[in-house]
């Protein structure tokens, strides 16, 4: 059996597993958060950390929503309140007792665009991908349910 990604898209969730020899070698889940790597958006610098090239921006998302992200590699002349185009380079990370904000970098001249979907990210690598209907049981057959249980309990 050839190595490939199996992909499902459901309501509010995308998931993909990389299978080879009937076994899951890796898994990815996307929950549709717009603030993830690849997003290019307008933002306002709301705080600049003194003496550094870092700060905090508020990104303008669809339908008037706004979210904050850390920003690094700010130009020296960027002052609080300035509007700039940024590209998200790291998604938010939830750790026990701590929420790390997404990270962005200035992206002058880039076209505004949403972050790529999980499917688009995989397809961009050139990897073989087979999209499945959500009614298929291929994920379960390859051990998806056990993998999710291991991730939730921390027991392998």
PLM ranges: what are they?
Residues 1-156:
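Single-stranded RNA-binding surfaces
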